[in-house]
């Protein structure tokens, strides 16, 4: 769907898209650095999330791993929800989740499905993680660091992550050529 975030693109793909869009528009378009991404995500907050700490109810704010992940438990040729009494149920509900929260969505959704942060940005936590143009080096770090890494940083977590893996400070490292199932990008 057009309103869905792009996923399964590598860092290299994202940077190439930014390069071509810059060329076409005459504007300098790129990915944010990790520091720029975190500043935009926090939107003036010093908490784990722009709306509170790790235990805040994210149901109306973000698309994270919640009780809707139980909907992955299906069976049959025409997949139907699996009854909790089914002996196989426990093997299909292994994904870690916050069962006390229901954000209403199982997988990634359009950008404006949840509330925007105070800067007007949507889905900074959850939905899909986002590439930054920063190398995965010691954190926190100085932007002028000489340290480098073969990995690039993705921030924000996704619909499959619990809050502790989607907080403002949470980072994930991937090779620049990796096309990760739950990672997309945001341009600046």
Tell where the protein language model's regions lie, with residue ranges.
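Short, positively biased Gly/Pro-containing turn/loop motifs at secondary-structure boundaries
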Residues: 173-176
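Functional-site microenvironments in short loops/helix caps that host divalent-cation chemistry
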Residues: 1-170, 181
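Short, structured beta-strand segments at or near domain termini in extracellular proteins/domains
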Residues: 181-188
